[in-house]
């Protein structure tokens, strides 16, 4: 029997893009990367675990901020190269800027406009030096 992780088309770095959506509203909260271990642990622990390319290690969403993403459903797209995580966003903040979503800017002819408010100051969320 084929392992479910073998069905995923990982990129040349062994990663797959993962989009987190609110399981109730469908709002896109963020995009991050997952490697095989991150996806396997996400399924096993029922919480979002990503691969941090900048830190080169697993990143359990909410490990510093407390803003954990509880997993409700995993979906794989038709090309098997993008994952969607349907999550419950604990604390209502997914973005390191203190906003609900990382997608808080809208394009207008004059450029990108910030349309979503900061819900909590990032300095109050993360330890010094973040």
From Swiss-Prot:
A Pfam short name: PRA-CH
EC number: 3.5.4.19
Gene3D superfamilies: Phosphoribosyl-AMP cyclohydrolase (3.10.20.810)
Binding-site residues, Mg(2+): 77, 79, 81
Localisation per UniProt entry: Cytoplasm
Domain of life: Bacteria
GO molecular function, one term: zinc ion binding
Family statement: Belongs to the PRA-CH family.
Function: Catalyzes the hydrolysis of the adenine ring of phosphoribosyl-AMP.
Assembly: Homodimer.
Protein name: Phosphoribosyl-AMP cyclohydrolase
Gene Ontology CC terms, in alphabetical order: cytoplasm
Pathway connected to this protein: Amino-acid biosynthesis; L-histidine biosynthesis; L-histidine from 5-phospho-alpha-D-ribose 1-diphosphate: step 3/9
HAMAP family for the chain: HisI
Cofactors that this protein relies on: Mg(2+); Zn(2+)
Source species of the chain: Pseudomonas syringae pv. syringae (strain B728a)
Reactions catalysed: 1-(5-phospho-beta-D-ribosyl)-5'-AMP + H2O = 1-(5-phospho-beta-D-ribosyl)-5-[(5-phospho-beta-D-ribosylamino)methylideneamino]imidazole-4-carboxamide
Binding site for Zn(2+): 78, 95, 102
Single Gene Ontology BP annotation: L-histidine biosynthetic process
Cross-referenced InterPro entries: PRA-CH, PRib_AMP_CycHydrolase_dom, PRib_AMP_CycHydrolase_sf
Gene: hisI
Cofactor remark from the record: Binds 1 Mg(2+) ion per subunit.
Alphabetical UniProt keywords: Amino-acid biosynthesis, Cytoplasm, Histidine biosynthesis, Hydrolase, Magnesium, Metal-binding, Zinc
């Amino acid at each position: 029997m084929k392992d479910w992780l073998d069905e995923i088309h990982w990129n040349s770095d062994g990663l797959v893009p993962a989009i987190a959506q609110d399981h109730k509203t469908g709002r896109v909260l963020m995009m991050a990367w997952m490697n095989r271990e991150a996806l396997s642990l996400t399924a096993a622990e029922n919480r979002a675990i990503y691969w941090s390319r900048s830190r080169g290690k697993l990143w359990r969403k909410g490990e510093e901020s407390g803003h954990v993403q509880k997993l409700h459903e995993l979906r794989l797209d038709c090309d098997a190269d993008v994952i969607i995580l349907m999550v419950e966003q604990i604390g209502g903040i997914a973005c390191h800027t203190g906003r609900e979503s990382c997608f808080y800017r809208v394009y207008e002819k004059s450029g990108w406009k910030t349309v979503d408010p900061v819900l909590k100051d990032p300095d109050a969320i993360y330890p010094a030096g973040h």
